[in-house]
């Protein structure tokens, strides 16, 4: 099966929880905008043959000199993914958050291989703490739960159909592989072997620097 994938790099978030005067994916990290750390890694992964950056037009200059396509960001995550999907030319697509500076080539290779067995796969890690449901209050079995990360990999036609279904039914998705779930397509879970960090709060940048 052809492992070639397109990467949709989501960069439309405003970073309101971070409190900075610019979106957190563009904050300085190792002397350049944070998002470029993930992009540079992705461009050296053989399975990724095209990258679509979904961002506001005013930030496109940040990606000058990189071989990427652009798509307009939408109101919701799923709208941005659908926008990027219109520029995808491969049968498989990876979706990655621009506020996650680390992409690991070995995990991308495994993720794609696993996704091709079922149609969709996502990186996950174990839940290390106790989780309680709010209403009614009860303790959940953390062994039955996983923390979801990106990238996620979905067959392009499945992602497109799932997003269209969600739009018709007025469903707001919380992650990208949920589009496959809506079509009753099983999603495979790939356990991450590396530290995962999403830049949400200022202290997350300190952690990211420590992981280099």
From Swiss-Prot:
Q: Which gene encodes it?
A: ispD
What reactions does this protein catalyze?
2-C-methyl-D-erythritol 4-phosphate + CTP + H(+) = 4-CDP-2-C-methyl-D-erythritol + diphosphate
Report keywords, A-Z: Isoprene biosynthesis, Nucleotidyltransferase, Transferase
Organism of provenance: Chlamydia caviae (strain ATCC VR-813 / DSM 19441 / 03DC25 / GPIC)
Write down the position(s) of the site called Transition state stabilizer: 17, 24
- Which processes are annotated in GO (biological process)? isopentenyl diphosphate biosynthetic process, methylerythritol 4-phosphate pathway
Q: Does the keyword Nucleotidyltransferase apply?
A: yes
Family of the protein in this entry: Belongs to the IspD/TarI cytidylyltransferase family. IspD subfamily.
Q: Could you say which residues are annotated as the site Positions MEP for the nucleophilic attack? A: 142, 198
Q: Spell out the InterPro entries in the cross-references.
A: IspD, IspD/TarI, IspD/TarI_cytidylyltransf_bact, ISPD_synthase_CS, Nucleotide-diphossugar_trans
**Entry's EC annotation:** 2.7.7.60
> Pfam families from the xrefs?
IspD
One of the entry's Gene Ontology molecular-function terms is:
2-C-methyl-D-erythritol 4-phosphate cytidylyltransferase activity
Pathway per its UniProt entry is:
Isoprenoid biosynthesis; isopentenyl diphosphate biosynthesis via DXP pathway; isopentenyl diphosphate from 1-deoxy-D-xylulose 5-phosphate: step 2/6
The name under which this protein is listed is 2-C-methyl-D-erythritol 4-phosphate cytidylyltransferase
Q: What does this protein do?
A: Catalyzes the formation of 4-diphosphocytidyl-2-C-methyl-D-erythritol from CTP and 2-C-methyl-D-erythritol 4-phosphate (MEP).
Q: Which domain of life is it from?
A: Bacteria
């Amino acid at each position: 099966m052809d492992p070639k994938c397109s990467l949709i790099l989501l960069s439309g978030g405003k970073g309101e929880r971070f409190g900075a005067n610019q979106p957190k994916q563009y904050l300085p990290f190792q002397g350049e905008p944070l998002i470029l750390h993930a992009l540079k890694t992705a461009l050296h992964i053989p399975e990724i043959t095209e990258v679509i950056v979904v961002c506001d037009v005013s930030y496109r200059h940040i990606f000058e000199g990189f071989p990427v396509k652009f798509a307009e960001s939408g109101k919701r995550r799923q709208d941005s993914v659908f926008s990027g999907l219109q520029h995808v030319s491969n049968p498989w697509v990876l979706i990655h958050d621009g506020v996650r500076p680390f992409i690991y080539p070995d995990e991308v290779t495994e993720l794609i291989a696993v996704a091709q067995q079922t149609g969709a796969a996502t990186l996950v890690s174990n839940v290390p703490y106790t989780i309680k449901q709010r209403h009614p209050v009860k303790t959940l079995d953390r062994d039955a739960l996983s923390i979801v990360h990106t990238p996620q990999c979905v067959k392009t036609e499945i992602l497109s159909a799932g997003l269209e279904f969600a739009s018709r039914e007025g469903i707001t998705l919380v992650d990208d592989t949920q589009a496959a779930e809506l079509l009753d397509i099983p999603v495979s879970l790939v356990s991450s072997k590396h530290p995962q960090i999403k830049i949400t709060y200022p202290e997350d940048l300190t952690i990211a620097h420590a992981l280099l």
